[in-house]
Amino acid sequence: MKQAFLSCALLLAAATAAPAAGLNLAWNNCAGDAGVQNIAFACDTNTGSRGLVCSIVLGRDIPDVAQSELVVDLVSASATLPDWWRFLTAGSCRQVSLSLSGHEGTNCPGFFAQSAVTNNGAYQVGKHGLPNEARLLSIHGVLAADAVAHFAGQEYGIARWTIMNTKTVGAPSCAGCQTPVCLVFNSARFTTPADTPVGTLLAAAANPGSNFVTWQGGAGTNCPEATPTRNTTWGSVKSLYR
């Protein structure tokens, strides 16, 4: 009888325990919509694109999120970051081949889906003094009056970085598409109108290995340990847009 009671108690605890909070990174879709962990691209076309999707699972309910800050780090297997992976900065080989938007999927509702959201992104090469490393920073926010309630255990899509295939072949083109790369979703911070700039920080994978993806297999990058885990402060991220 005691054994049966104990078994029932364990089953009940398992059923009611909150899912682990954390970060998910996947190609093309969020984790819950069968996003994939690796992209193997033949590097034979200038058309098409793929999406790098950041999603999260909260460990507690937050009634009025107004802003989110995301940090994704990447490292290449080469000694220096290939030209194919140089975006946004004036004069970079693929300056306009990277763009940022929110993400909403079937099993991962958009983090700010029902609000007028602003998405701002930055791309920093050699952020930590490493010539083969870069950092993607993004801020997503709504007006305080439009702050949105979020709930523990639900996967939410937040960001989609779209990487286009422009300048892969022909002339002019940018070398390095075939180079393996590792990308790691290192942190996400959420703030409400009341707790800015402290907020709630997530800095671990929702499931083992769910916070990193690879490009061309990622060989030679020591993925995911190769990327820095030092988080950028909220204030320093916002200063990028002033």
Predicted regions and their residues:
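Bacterial N-terminal signal peptides that target proteins for export
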Residues: M1-C8
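Structured beta-strand segments within beta-sheet-rich domains
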Residues: I39-F41, N46-S49, V53-S55, S99-A171
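Extracellular secreted precursors and ectodomains with disulfide-bonded cysteine-rich loops/domains
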Residues: N28, F41, G91, T106, ...
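Boundary/junction segments of secreted and surface-exposed precursor proteins
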Residues: A17-D44, T221-R242
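Hydrophobic h-region of N-terminal signal peptides that target proteins for export
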Residues: A9-P19
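Short beta-strand elements
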Residues: P197-T227
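Low-complexity, serine/threonine/proline/glycine-rich extracellular segments that form mucin-like
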Residues: A21-G22, A26-N119
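Ser/Thr/Pro-rich, low-complexity mucin-like regions
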Residues: L58-P63, G141-N207
